[in-house]
Amino acid sequence: MKNKVRTIHMVGIGGSGMSGIAEVLLNLGYAVHGSDMSDSAVVRRLRKIGAEIFIGHGAGNVSDAEVLVKSTAVRDDNPEVLAAVEKGIPIIPRAEMLAELMRLRTGIAIAGTHGKTTTTSLTAAIFDVAGKDPTVIIGGRLNAYGANARLGEGEYLIAEADESDGSFLCLFPIVNVVTNVDMDHVDFYAGQKEIDEAFVTFMNKVPFYGANVVCGDDPGVRRLLPQVKRRVVTYGFGKDNALRAEVTSCAETSVFTVFLRGGRLGEVHLGQPGRHNILNALAAIGVALEAGISPEHCIEGLARFGGVGRRFERRGERDGVTVVDDYGHHPVEIAATLATARSVYPDRRLVVVFQPHRFSRTQALFGEFCKVFEPVDKLLLTEIYPASEKPIPGVSGQSLAQGIRQVSNTDVTYYQSFDEILAALPGVLRPGDVLLTLGAGSVTTIGQRYVAGE
């Protein structure tokens, strides 16, 4: 029955969640076409491997589709959605398509407010080294694949599970990971209670023979554990965790020893710096051990891991300035990234360009955003990246800059456009500085343009 549908249309096919699914569907032999608002490297890659992609949305784009896949960011009045309704074409959310793919394999779902992409990628690296040949779908470009997805021949599908719209509850994995539970996605959840309920439901969806691998150091996770009725494996730095790390160093690289219920598994050398990445690696080890992978393969896989795009990614140098780019856009993520930057570059001046992401997040976490940039020597702040949201009165990049000045000593300047920032950078930067671009939107282009000499 499932083979009756062969032609799939994806609205917003270039998005981080959609593109990986599209790539796997193409590799499975489905005809995939889709649309996106702009051309991009992701769109070009999908075209290269066989997808037909339209720039812009139009009713004619769905003419021969047998099913339409969309993310929750796509509105019901989108012309392609309306055309599908008129033609009687089934419309399904992105997560439902991911759930169908997961049904073909033994599913592993990586969830949490922060660290999902890196943890998914680290898990995939271990499974690759162990010869498991997994199918992998993540939200960022994995350097080892040159893409954010691959179709494997093995039994496992390792996927990043998106809690932002509750869609991770569509999945039926055998093993779950929860890296942390923080307040976020206020455009969807009414408050922390709703977020907590979603994660509890997620953890209780694993079968009786499955497991939840969770960060025992995270207060949000610990708060929920009494409500979890399925098996739990905790990881972290605390001695009460089942899987524990003792850190030797986490500056340029991370070196740590792993213990399982008191027994030493071995020393890990990870190329990525930062305590948050050690936690991500512990989660990956926990999943691998659940799959019967040896500690030796875990250590080898982590040692070989080549990183993920936009996760403390070094983009180059210009005039003695080192340029680093990071996806961090929530105060907790930003704090971890700044701590890593200070650890890796302890004696260098840190200049940050930050593009806030979503009006709703900026409003809900305004106080945290105002305080998190204290470790920065100079902050250049630009306008909020809307991510399909409508503006909220009184919430802007400029109002955030004013708030930062009121509650902290951070040296902050607001710029309305990227061109203004690029024009200002030569007067701000000095040889030996580190320029860090931060945000989930388009801010990465500033580092690219600066290195290119624009």
Swiss-Prot record:
Its EC number is 6.3.2.8. The keyword Ligase applies. It is found in: Cytoplasm. ATP binds at residues 112-118. The gene is murC. It comes from Nitratidesulfovibrio vulgaris (strain ATCC 29579 / DSM 644 / CCUG 34227 / NCIMB 8303 / VKM B-1760 / Hildenborough) (Desulfovibrio vulgaris). This is UDP-N-acetylmuramate--L-alanine ligase. Keywords: ATP-binding, Cell cycle, Cell division, Cell shape, Cell wall biogenesis/degradation, Cytoplasm, Ligase, Nucleotide-binding, Peptidoglycan synthesis. Cell wall formation. Pathway: Cell wall biogenesis; peptidoglycan biosynthesis. InterPro entries: Mur-like_cat_sf, Mur_ligase_C, Mur_ligase_C_dom_sf, Mur_ligase_cen, Mur_ligase_N, MurCDEF_pg_biosynth, UDP-N-AcMur_Ala_ligase_MurC. GO terms for biological process: cell division; cell wall organization; peptidoglycan biosynthetic process; regulation of cell shape. GO terms for molecular function: ATP binding; UDP-N-acetylmuramate-L-alanine ligase activity. Gene3D superfamilies: Mur ligase, C-terminal domain, Mur-like, catalytic domain, NAD(P)-binding Rossmann-like Domain. Belongs to the MurCDEF family. HAMAP family: MurC. GO terms for cellular component: cytoplasm. It catalyses: UDP-N-acetyl-alpha-D-muramate + L-alanine + ATP = UDP-N-acetyl-alpha-D-muramoyl-L-alanine + ADP + phosphate + H(+). It comes from the Bacteria. It is an enzyme of class 6 (ligase). It holds the Pfam family Mur_ligase_C.
